[in-house]
Each structure stands twice: as structure tokens, then as C-alpha cells.
Amino acid sequence: MESSKDTQHGDALESKSCLANRTSSRQNKRTSLSSSDGTGPRVTESLGLPRVLTPSDTAAELGQKTSSSSSSSSSSAQSNRSSKVSLPEIPKEKYPEEFSLLNSQTEDGQRPEWTFYPRFSSNIHTYHIGKQCFFNGVFRGNRRSVAERTVDNSLGKKKYDIDPRNGIPKLTPGDNPYMFPEQSKEFFKAGATLPPVNFSLGPYEKKFDTFIPLEPLPKIPNLPFWEKEKANNLKNEIKEVEELDNWQVPMPFLHGFFSTGASNFSRQQ
């Protein structure tokens, strides 16, 4: 009997020690999971079996808690979203090339030729500074290349046959193909390309090209019709009188008739 009591007492002590170990291990699990960032599953224990919560369950619980507060502030947030929109953070590890375009200055402290900001929403303008025209400290925004060919010069042709200068050589150092001579180097040392203007106090005198002035042309005579007709009749009468000097006696009718008949009869035979 005493041996059976000792065995029962030992079993009870073992069961109590096992329960104590289980409770201590569960408490350690709770503390370790609560100290984490909350991204993994969370173990909750009730009186019965333990329950494991997945991230979807935690998101549902958070959505139920914040639904009431988000509904009240959604209207005000939408009104201010168009005016105040902050750029989201871009990780350098994922997009290294795109992130390098966001730098406003280069390593030497100069502004780059292009500055680009990505368009994350329609309310943000993409280009803030835009294209720069300074290359190595030289302004090249209004320069033209000698090899540049416009559409007018090459329209409808496969070869560039039109010379923009039409074969005229360069006359002066200021005669350059640039739009503005101010951007050319030392343009003021070449002098003026046009002759200077001469101002005088005297009156203006017109100078003729020739010594003989041009005279007005004589008037063309314009006679009436009856005078022209009278002159034509007079010319015809004079011509008829002149032809009388060459007048000849006409041939008699019968003589001519018989002569023509005899000739026709001989031909028929």
C-alpha cells in the first residue's frame, strides 16, 4: 500500500512539473511574438486549444478598428490630396538607375543637362527644371551646326543638292551661321558687318542716274471713223486712175467661144 501511494505522489509531482514547463514556454512565446514587428503569425491561447492568427486575420481586425476613423477623414483627405501629394519613397536597391535621375546636382556641384521626376500621379508635373543649355560652361542653346539640313532643303530629294549659302564664301569673321552673333567668341572685335550711317544737317537732294532727264512720249493720234473712211476712199480712187495706164482691149466673146470649142473637139477625137 505504501509503495502504491509513493508512486501516485511521484506521478502527481511529475504532472505538476510538466504543467509548469508548458505555461512557462507559452509565456515566453507570447513575449517573443509581442516584441516582434507583427508581420508573422500571432499565437493566442484560450481556455481550450490555442489559436494561430494569420496576417489576413490581423489585417481584417485592423480594418474593422480603423473603418470608423477612416470614413470621417476620407472626405477631407480627398480634398487635400490634389493640392498636397508627397512623392513616395523609392528604394535604391530596387531601382538604382531611376533613383539616380532624381539627383538635383551632380558630383561636382553643377546642375545636369536633364532633370527628371517620375510621374506617380496626374497631379504632379513631371519636369521641374527641364533641359539645360550649358555644356561644359558654354551656352549652346542657339547654335547651329554646319552639317544641319532643314526640311525645306531636303524635301522631296534623297540627296542634299541645295547649298544654304549658294556658294558664297565667308566674308567677315562676324558672318557666321549662328542665330545671334553675341554668342560667338569675341564677336565685337570683328567690327560692324554693315557700313556706318552718315548723318547730315543739310536738306536731302535727289540725284539722277543720268544727265539727260526722261521726256514724256508723244501722243498717239486718234482720228474718228469718218475721217479714216474718207482717206481710204481717196487712196482707192488714186489707185484706179494709175491702173488706167496699163489698160488693154478685151477679147471678143465669139472668138473666144469658138477657139475653146475647137480645142475641146480635137481632144475628144
UniProtKB/Swiss-Prot annotation:
Keyword presence, Phosphoprotein: yes
Residue positions, PTM Phosphothreonine: T54
Residues bearing the modification Phosphoserine: S72, S75, S82
Composition-biased stretches (Basic and acidic residues): 1-14
Domain of life: Eukaryota
Composition bias type Low complexity, residue spans: 67-86
A matching Pfam family: SASRP1
Keyword Phosphoprotein: yes
Ranges where the record places region Disordered: 1-92
InterPro entries with a match to the protein in the record: SASRP1
S-S bonds: none
Keyword set, alphabetical order: Phosphoprotein
UniProt biased composition (Polar residues): 18-38
PANTHER family tied to this protein: SPERMATOGENESIS-ASSOCIATED SERINE-RICH PROTEIN 1
Record-given protein name: Spermatogenesis-associated serine-rich protein 1
Encoding gene (name): Spats1
